[in-house]
Amino acid sequence: MKYDDGRVLDTMVEVWDRAPGKPSPFDGLWTLKKRQTDNPELTNFTETKMIGGGHYIILQSANYRGERVRNFGFGTFDVKEDGKVLETGMVGSWEDYSGWATEVKFEMTDESHMTQSFIFNDREITQTYVRM
C-alpha cells in the first residue's frame, strides 16, 4: 500500500501482549446507578467501569463546584484473600494518579449488580453498579 506522502506499507504486523492478572467475579462492564457520599460540591456524577483480568478502566463525568469535569483512569485490580480489592492507578487524568492506591470493598449483590465502598478525602463513598 502506498500513501500520498510516499510511504509504502508492504506488511503490517501487530503483536499483542496480555497484561498479567487474574480474572475475578467482578470482571465486566459496569455503569454507575447510585452514589452515596456527603460531598455537596460534586453533583451529576456518572461513571463507567470496566474490570477484567486484574485491571480496571474508569471513565467519570461530574460537576465540581458548578464546573464540568471529566476524568479517566487505568490500573491494576488485585483481589485480596479477605475479599477486598487493592486498586492501584497506572495512568489517568488526575494529578499524581500513577501509583495512587486505595483499598475498596466490593460485593456482588446478584449476577448483574455490585457495590463498592471506599474512603476518599476522609469521606466514605458507596457506589452501586449494574452490569451493561
Task: Go through the PLM ranges and name each one.
Residues 1-76, 80, 84-132:
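Lipid interaction determinants
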